[in-house]
Design a protein with these regions (language model features):
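Hydrophobic core of transmembrane alpha-helices in multi-pass small-molecule transporters
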Residues: 104, 117-137, 362-376
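A late C-terminal transmembrane helix in Major Facilitator Superfamily
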Residues: 317, 386-423
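Helix-loop-helix hairpin linking two adjacent transmembrane segments in secondary transporters
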Residues: 162-215
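Central cavity-lining transmembrane alpha-helices of secondary-active solute carriers
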Residues: 68-83, 307-320
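Cytoplasmic helix-loop-helix junction between adjacent transmembrane helices
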Residues: 127-166
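C-terminal transmembrane helical hairpin of 12-TM major facilitator-type secondary transporters
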Residues: 335-381
Length: 461
């Protein structure tokens, strides 16, 4: 009988000199794929919005409310999803999340097949609301996985890569969804994305495990992660050996929530993320409609043009993470290494206002691309969450951050709908979006001081 020795079972001195595995990058690749589908599902309505409005006679204000349905549910479900993540872990909760949001996306393909137009509008609102609830654990789970699998000096790049999936989704899926809508009808967009997501949920369960439990991880990689600040032990601490309640589940009480909400640094981070997401939700909801209505593009052309700023956003997102981690490796403080890309990138994104002063379609796309590039550079909020979240409450902390950030998904689509409906143009809407970028700069320069991990006080201390 042959004895096989796992790399993790090697003597300590041999394990340290052994070439470390790179399983964390495969986990990051999985996060990227899941987040890409996540954002593709969010963007379905922006691509199919024009034919849906025409089919059911929906006015701009009503469309704004339908756009916001996702975010109403997404925000309300954040704290419960944070508790679930800290109680049961990212692997199981995220798998359930992927399956459910994909099932609800699939159900949207049946809207309008029977009943009145009013019923179809109500059903669309309800299904978007359900998708919002199901997707709520996604980004807090991403942050929890990154905090567990990556050391501090790699965390900015890892967070930027999974966050850049939103732009990659626009690059790949916006033209694809526009083509499906043009060639086969908008119902097919929801049908095929829903089926793809159901399959992905089972793949996630098969591939993703906690660092300490993954059979392909050797001791050298575990030590690299843990000694660099990765919370490899926290990923499994939430599960007791007999299923008893853990520290991760006990922390989800209002006593701890109040501590997080009273922290000046976190308040500034929450405000900044809200304003960043105003730009995000403009691109996710109204941007294709802006290109069709204000710039006279066809739906198919708008779908392809949407991908160009998204490419720039993707490149900016990866560059921002690499720049931040590069500064840390060169001895720059964590605070400056995170703030420099965020402040610089969001200042650059204000060029979106310039679209009000040009007539050329080419210049509009260029300005939007520069704005999206800046937003990508500045989208390091999830790296900041991984840097600052209390070790025993990463899921809860990420959920609070995501809850405040995605309040913009409620406010921005409705506000833009009113601005467009009242004025008949998108000029005021673009100023509104650009000013939110300015508030992000203010928040990180004035409100957020030192960026550091929060230490919670416990009642029995």
């Amino acid at each position: 009988m042959t004895n096989q020795t796992s790399p993790r079972d090697l003597p300590l001195d041999l394990a340290r000199t052994a070439r470390r595995t790179a399983v964390r990058y495969w986990i990051l690749a999985m996060l990227f794929v899941v987040t890409t589908l996540n954002y593709a599902d969010r963007a379905t309505l922006s691509i199919t919005g024009t034919p849906i409005r025409q089919a059911f006679g929906i006015d701009p204000v009503t469309m704004g409310y339908i756009f916001s349905a996702f975010s109403w549910a997404y925000v309300l479900a954040q704290l419960p999803s944070g508790w679930l993540l800290d109680r049961f872990g990212a692997r199981r909760v995220y798998a359930a999340s992927i399956f459910l949001w994909s099932a609800f996306t699939l159900l949207q393909s049946t809207i309008g097949l029977g009943g009145s137009a009013a019923f179809a509008v109500a059903a669309l609102f309800a299904m978007r609301f359900a998708v919002g609830i199901a997707e709520a654990p996604a980004f807090p789970a991403n942050a929890k996985v990154v905090a567990s699998w990556f050391p501090t000096a790699e965390r900015g790049t890892a967070s930027a890569i999974f966050n850049a999936a939103q732009y990659f989704a626009a690059v790949v899926f916006s033209p694809l969804m526009a083509w499906l809508t043009h060639a086969y009808g908008w119902h097919h967009v929801y049908l095929w994305l829903g089926l793809a997501g159901v399959a992905l949920a089972f793949l996630w369960l098969r591939v993703v495990k906690d660092p300490a439990d993954h059979p392909a991880v050797n001791r050298a990689e575990l030590e690299h992660i843990e000694q660099g600040g990765g919370l490899v032990r926290s990923a499994t601490a939430a599960r007791g050996s007999n299923g008893s309640r853990s520290e991760g589940s006990r922390v989800a009480g209002w006593y701890y929530v109040r501590q997080l909400l009273s922290n000046r640094m976190l308040i500034g981070v929450y405000l900044g993320q809200y304003c960043v997401n105003v730009l995000t939700y403009f691109f996710l909801t109204w941007f294709p409609i802006y290109l069709v209505q204000a710039r006279g593009m066809s739906l198919l052309k708008a779908g392809f043009m949407t991908s160009l700023p998204a490419i720039c956003g993707f490149l900016g997102g990866v560059l921002g993470g690499m720049l931040s981690d590069g500064l840390i490796r060169r001895g720059v403080s964590l605070t400056l290494a995170r703030k420099i890309p965020i402040v610089g990138g969001m200042a650059l994104s204000m060029v979106i206002i310039g679209c009000n002063y040009v007539d050329s379609e080419v210049l509009v796309i260029v300005l939007m691309a520069v704005s999206f590039f800046g937003k990508g550079i500045g989208s390091l909020g999830w790296a900041v969450v991984a840097d600052t979240a209390p070790k025993e409450a990463i899921g809860l902390s990420g959920s609070l951050f995501n809850m405040f950030g995605n309040t913009a998904g409620i406010v921005a689509p409705i506000a833009i709908g009113y601005l467009v409906g009242a004025s008949g143009s998108f000029n005021g809407a673009l100023v509104f979006v650009g000013l939110n970028a300015l508030v992000t700069v203010f928040s990180y320069l004035v409100i957020v001081k030192d960026i550091k991990r929060v230490e919670l006080r416990h009642r029995d201390a």
